[in-house]
Regions:
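Short, Lys/Arg-rich, polar N-terminal cytosolic tail immediately upstream
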Residues: 2-24
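Membrane-interfacial loop-to-transmembrane-helix junctions in polytopic alpha-helical membrane proteins
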Residues: 22-29, 85-95, 121-128, 160-174
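N-terminal signal-anchor transmembrane alpha helix
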Residues: 25-64
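Interfacial segments of alpha-helical transmembrane regions
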Residues: 30-38, 116, 121-138
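Hydrophobic core of alpha-helical transmembrane segments in multi-pass integral membrane proteins
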Residues: 34-49, 108, 113, 183-193
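Extracytosolic (periplasmic/ER-lumenal) interhelical loops and adjacent juxtamembrane/interface segments
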Residues: 53-93
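Hydrophobic alpha-helical transmembrane segments
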Residues: 95-116, 183
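Alpha-helical transmembrane segments of multi-pass integral membrane proteins
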Residues: 136-191
Length: 204
C-alpha cells in the first residue's frame, strides 16, 4: 500500500504536526499561562514596541502607519516613505523585520493560549481551531517583510514594486480579517463557557 493511500485513509498522519501543536496548547494552556502571555504582550507593546516605532515617527505626518490600516495602495506607501529620511526608513525596515515580527509571535501565542483555555472542553469537536491566531501572525509576517522589501527598494532607486505593494496590502487586509475572526472565536468561547457553567449550576 502506498504512503499516499495511507494518508488519505488517515488524515491525522498528514496533519500530524498541526494536530500535535494544537494538542500541546490545549494541554499546557491555563489561566496562569494566558495571563502571563497577556502581561508579556502588554509590556512589550507599551515599553518596547512603541519606543521602536518613534524612531521613524514624523510629526503631523499624513500617514503615520501602514500596518495599522485595512489595506493600502502604492500612493500611500510612497507618501509614507517620501516623508522620511534614509535613517528613518532603515529604522522602519529593522522595525518590520525584527521588532514587529516578534510582536506578532507574542500576540499569536497569547491568543492561542486564551482560545485553548476557552475551547479545552470542546477540543475534540473543534480540533485545531485554537491555532487560528497563528494565521494572523503568518499574514502579519508577509506584510512586514513585503514592506521591508519595498522600503529597501525605495532607498535604492526611489521606486516601489507594484506586485510587492499588492502583496503587502493584501496581507494586511487578510491579517485584520483573521484578527476579527480571532476576537469572534474568543467571544463565542467565553459565551459557551459561561452558558455551560450556568447549566451545571442549575442542575445542582
Amino acid at each position: 500500500m502506498s504512503s499516499k493511500s495511507i494518508e488519505s485513509k488517515n488524515p491525522s498522519i498528514k496533519f500530524g504536526p498541526l494536530i500535535r501543536a494544537s494538542q500541546f496548547f490545549y494541554t499546557k494552556s491555563n489561566l496562569i499561562t494566558a495571563l502571563l502571555a497577556t502581561s508579556v504582550f502588554a509590556g512589550y507593546l507599551l515599553f518596547f514596541l512603541t519606543g521602536k516605532g518613534k524612531a521613524f515617527e514624523v510629526a503631523n505626518s499624513s500617514i503615520k502607519s501602514l500596518g495599522t490600516s485595512l489595506g493600502f495602495g502604492q500612493v500611500e506607501i510612497l507618501a509614507f516613505l517620501a516623508e522620511r529620511s534614509d535613517q528613518m526608513i532603515n529604522d522602519y525596515i529593522n522595525f518590520n523585520q525584527v521588532w514587529d515580527s516578534l510582536f506578532a509571535l507574542i500576540y499569536g501565542v497569547m491568543y492561542v493560549a486564551w482560545v485553548s483555555i476557552l475551547f479545552k472542553p470542546y477540543s475534540k469537536k473543534v480540533g485545531v481551531l485554537n491555532l487560528l491566531p497563528f494565521a494572523q501572525v503568518l499574514f502579519d509576517w508577509f506584510e512586514n517583510f513585503s514592506l521591508a522589501t519595498l522600503s529597501k527598494q525605495f532607498l535604492a532607486d526611489g521606486t516601489i514594486s507594484s506586485s510587492t505593494a499588492l502583496i503587502a496590502s493584501t496581507s494586511s487586509s487578510i491579517k485584520w480579517v483573521f484578527s476579527l475572526l480571532v476576537y469572534g472565536v474568543i467571544l463565542v468561547g467565553a459565551v459557551m463557557r459561561i452558558v455551560g457553567a450556568m447549566k451545571r449550576r442549575s442542575q445542582r
